[in-house]
Amino acid sequence: MAVLLGVHVLGLLVLAVLRLVLFVAGHSMLSADSAGKAGLQSLAFLHGLWFDNVIACYILIVPLAVILLSCAIGLRSRLPLVCSVRWMQTLWGVAFAVSAANIPYFLYFFKNINSSIWNWAEYGTTTFGMLFGEASYYPPMLAFIVLLTVFIWASNRWMRRFVMPPPSSRLLVRLPALALGLACIGLCLFGIRGRRGYNPIKVSAAYYCQDPFLNQLGVNPAFNLLTSTLDDFRPENALLHLMDNAEALDRTRAYLKRQGPEDAPLQYELQPADTIKGKRNVVLIFMESMSADFMQAFGQKQCLTPFLDSLYRNSLSFANCYSAGIHTNHGLYATLYSYPALMYRNLMKGSNIPTYSGLPTALREAGYRNLFFMTHESQYDNMNAFLRTNGYDEIYAQENYPKEQVVNSFGVQDDYMYRYALKVLDRFDGKSEPFFATLLSISNHPPYVIPEHFRPKSEDEETQIVEYADWALRLFFDEARKKPWYANTVFVLIGDHGKLVGEAESVNPESYNHVPLMIHVPGGTPQIRREWALQMDVQPTLLGLLGIGARQHNFGVDLNRIKRPCAFYTADNVICARDSSRFYVYEPSTGQEHFYRDGKNADGADSIFSEMRNYLFSMIQSAQYLLQQGKTTVR
């Protein structure tokens, strides 16, 4: 027993070291109220030990049972002990790997590693390249290798020093050891349960203060990955149960002013505004991880995006636009088809691909040729199948580019893809059919590759890559202006999602979802609009401006006709609603609610919060219901 308990303690020490590494690396994420409060911060490590011990007890329970059984039958071999230690070394190695991987994951997403990572599992080569192509991931990998090596060496040394007691065939002599073993197993089972209450330990037990960084620091990454994965397979968690489906749909129809038929309850006829005369080409650019907070227009002190800032001032721009989620597939899905994201689910994946009435289908019906350009492989996130099923005629991806232009697991760099797209679009002389070209950039996503021909001004790699992304966009527009189709084209630029910029002011930092949205018409009148805008609203707003009438069945609104009371969006495990002063966050898996007002924790009794909750719950629940029922197209 002593050997097993020694390995148990040693494993807990290694997890504590990895937690300390995350704390140091993410120290800037501490809220102002928590900074400098060592006592408050130390409680996160205490909670971490609590959660680490749960995983440790899962690892320990089988070796304890093996040793107890060998003692009960009077086995005289060291083999059970050796096998038990090897078992523990293997599973502890997995736990260390998850904790090490959680360091860059948390620093990027401000969330502990969870079941959403399985979405990347089927893209082995791409994911492998992402992991080993980003230099900032090397320190956690090195820490894992060093700590695992030390752990194995120390546990082996501890096992070799242990002297087996002389075997006895008398049961009475073995009874004390058996009693001790049974007691240890009982304590281990209690450790797995984690607490004495009616329910076993859950992630919510780690939340002890108002600082989201400290609250999440106390959660063991392997525990979070395990429980979130198991939750995915539980029937009661397969679907969200925010409110009754009928009530949600009734509320949503009232909010959106829709009275469609039973098989298409949100259907309506979009009335074009015909603001932009003539049938214009459309270029839609998704900017990878482009948080609005990178732009000086939104308070950024460094000059990272001079071109975007200039374009923002000379376009129809929306200051309060929010992404549907925090992953690229969410941004594509919401912007192109006007449906909200459903937490961390990738709604473009699956062999049974649903069909949608979206921007590509509406433009195709209006006589457009639809093209999609991406930097990586077309199979990633099931894009090729999903996009071709839902309105796109041509897909250009890594398979189309020269191999020497591929720089990492996500394919070519932005400026190459932009130049390639311009060559493809050269076949449109302005006299033939109009085109709708969608370009998905990638550079502002790890692993970062800054080309040698670009000279950034900032010092940090994460800001240098933003400078490069902006520079590549300028290059695209400089070349596009020389094309005969340029003056007859509408350009739409939007962030697919954001990323953490600056400090984390809440459990779900605003910079993850606050994205720039610009509709640029050469020669048009610039305007900055400040009403709430969502990625879902791009389709109806753009069609209205283009003068294209279309039957719609989705959650988007024409921002020139309808104003939303607030913004709503998701971020993996939470759903959120935001107005000018309030921010509401709900975690369906735990039922936890967070209320903020003017950036500070607030009382949820405010009636406005209740209205925001109803708006949020109605939209998300209705979207899930319509998708479940296959009611995603016009009738």
Regions found by a protein language model. Name each.
Residues M1-E236:
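Transmembrane and membrane-interface helices of multi-pass
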Residues S42-F45, A65, T127-L131, L226, ...:
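Generic structural signal of hydrophobic/aromatic residues within well-ordered alpha-helices
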Residues A72, L239, E452-F454:
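Surface-exposed, active-site-proximal loop segments in enzymatic domains
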Residues R78-L79, E236-E247, M348-N352, G556-V557:
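Short alpha-helical "patches" and their helix-cap loops
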Residues L256-R635:
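Solvent-exposed soluble domains appended to multi-pass membrane proteins
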Residues Y123-T126, Y207, D211, G218-F223, ...:
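The feature marks either
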Residues Y137-L142, V146, A246-K257, L387:
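Long, well-ordered, tryptophan-enriched scaffold segments
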